[in-house]
């Protein structure tokens, strides 16, 4: 069933979508080159305010890196670092407050860019709902389905 939804709290909706999409994404820490797990990693917000999820790090790796350097491993001046996907709604709101969107050439960046752009620019969204998952397979209609 296709439903049109008028969003009142876009930040909450983005928070839910960011968490929902993340398990289908794969990227690696750009310092140690190990894959980031389901908990995600850390992304830097540069001066332009555009996130590049292909340039993410483990929290421990970027903390070690920042001890002796002012710039990230890509020689970018970073204004803020955020956990991604944001673990809480509060952190998601802070992230969205300081970013303008997503940039990058890989599939993950394109997916998040489309979702962010769609939610932030549209007043109403078409959402596909699957009501079948809410019912048990052996459920019967009361009154014989009439």
UniProtKB/Swiss-Prot annotation:
It comes from the Viruses. InterPro entries: Baculovirus_U-box/Ring-like. Pfam families: Baculo_RING. This is Uncharacterized 17.0 kDa protein. It comes from Orgyia pseudotsugata multicapsid polyhedrosis virus.
């Amino acid at each position: 069933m296709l439903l049109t939804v008028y969003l009142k709290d876009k930040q909450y909706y983005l928070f839910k979508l960011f968490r929902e999409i993340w398990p289908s994404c794969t990227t690696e820490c750009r310092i140690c080159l190990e894959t980031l797990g389901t908990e995600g990693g850390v992304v830097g917000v540069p001066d332009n305010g555009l996130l590049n999820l292909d340039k993410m790090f483990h929290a421990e790796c970027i903390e070690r890196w920042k001890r002796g350097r002012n710039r990230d491993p890509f020689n970018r001046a970073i204004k803020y670092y955020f956990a991604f996907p944001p673990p809480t709604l509060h952190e998601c709101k802070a992230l969205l407050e300081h970013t303008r969107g997503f940039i990058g050439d890989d599939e993950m960046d394109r997916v998040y860019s489309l979702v962010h752009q769609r939610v932030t620019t549209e007043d109403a969204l078409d959402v596909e709902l699957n009501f079948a998952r809410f019912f048990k397979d052996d459920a019967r209609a009361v009154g014989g389905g009439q």
